């Protein structure tokens, strides 16, 4: 079976098996990570036979949301007008939120105790656990549903890159994404004579710690981003925290090898423990002291182990490695995180 056979996984619903739902999706309409996930959710729910109307979460007020919908999905709500001033009770209210650290603040939890929220959805057990760290009461059930892969990412031709190309993704949150470990490991490997092409995606090209390293400014249009992504061979991702970190499963679905921190939210969605090179974690660290919502600790990847695991990935790389990955495990990730499969999980909770 060729990979391209899975690229157009069109789901045709049975009209007799569907309970048609009218859904208001209150979301970020910009092309950021949550905006893209909300777009995939909307697309999936519509293809399952439901009516979905989107509202811009950053500008809409409580009194502006109209009645008449069965479900109101708030796709991330922290620090919006709706968070500070409340949400209406027209239908069933479902809030999707995340936890970048291992604890959600009392300010965030106050919202869930005093607003008419019926259900909470998070993208990982890590995020779910963070809601309970402070041991404050939470009246709603919390469900875990992973993010979806963008099906169009598989249609872009891989960019011609020097091989082996090791990719690091640092578009924001330098400390959380492990930027210090990335640049230091890259430099140490280069100084030791290892043959590889390091590439870092960053938002700030003036970052002084990038001096002497290959960097590309982000954000990029999807065709450019995924072509570059698919052209690389190894994702080096010594991340410290995050609620899901989709580059990990994107890399596996594109055939890359992955070197990533153990124990975080992303580790829950690896289909086989041997699919990645795990960086050991020795302790937790506090990095954020002024964040209103994410008040817990991050994981601290072991620097020496990060170095050694990237060395192992480079030692095991060969020109046919990508082809082998694409013909085997990549297929499994594309199917598991297909947007229709994820929309079906949402559908069960909305019903």
From Swiss-Prot:
This is Putative glycosyltransferase 45. It comes from Sulfolobus islandicus filamentous virus (isolate Iceland/Hveragerdi) (SIFV). It comes from the Viruses. GO terms for molecular function: glycosyltransferase activity. Keywords: Glycosyltransferase, Transferase. Belongs to the glycosyltransferase group 1 family. The keyword Glycosyltransferase applies. It is an enzyme of class 2 (transferase). Its EC number is 2.4.-.-.
